[in-house]
């Protein structure tokens, strides 16, 4: 009897181990199946090391890339190819965040049940992106050979409409790797971080709104310089006495340095974190770069950090989401690049992308920031430069040192669209990056 009991216990133990192992295997298959299926050694979907299946389209059905056994076929228009390089990818798979790398599992048509069976997946292995190829071309033209990036998304749906990074190359033309500029194979809006310059004053403003009493009555007298710990923070010109609206619209470095010092490093750190600027967003499995900040205990460094300098570095997409949250009363959709995928010939195989949302601000704070950003345009940048957009914006001039001209930033929103634009070494923000933003937004909103 005892032998039977021992055997029964042993059998049950082995059965339990088998079930646990089976559950673990199914879990691994579900989570990693697409990666395993799209491995380079799979001759069923690769030819001579090149992906031989799958296609990428823009939101309107424009073909951007089609993989065949004879090689990768790109759109016939060279401008579209250059403008969408960082979203679509190159033949050498150099851009890790591009569709032909990041969405490879979807392009091979992998399904948990059917695998990559060609009978069931057929020719419908396609990824429909959220981007508008024509909007990307407008951004590419507006940058006019200058290095930088343009990103626009619908803050209500999360769909990224425009995502351009320069320098770029034509993926359909073979290039000598030694002639490719540094940074060509990096999607800067997703994978890089930059000194934000005065765009960061929107973070300091949010912190001041929620932590400084009687901010509506606060004023600051700008004499063109502000001394902290025996060192000067300067403005390009004397602004005189300004309230918080005037301080932001004039981008007064002295006023904002004083606010940052008064608020303190702990508060500034809290708001950089809370507003999503140190977070990594998940864009359909693509992890964005995390911003980094150092709100030093030395007041002079804290003052510079409060105006977007010192060691401040922000990821462009994170800043764009913050703009969306200001537009959306404190909340915004998380960005996405996939509009839908078709993995199979079976009915109902067309799957739409869904985006979550983030809550970054109170509705009251967002409302005040909206009013102030609208005032920036009306009193400084000029509505006539952005006709019909009812633009809310903030410019930034980010000093990068090494004797180079500063980076020009322009970020904000118009209607349902939040944006961030940077022209590297472009000089003053509104003058260099503003026209780029206008051209792209005019196209998207027409």
Give the positions of each predicted feature.
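Periplasmic/cell-envelope proteins involved in peptidoglycan metabolism and beta-lactam response
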Residues: 1-177, 184, 193, 266-274, ...
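Beta-lactam-recognizing serine transpeptidase/beta-lactamase-like catalytic domain environment
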Residues: 60, 156-192, 206-429, 445-446
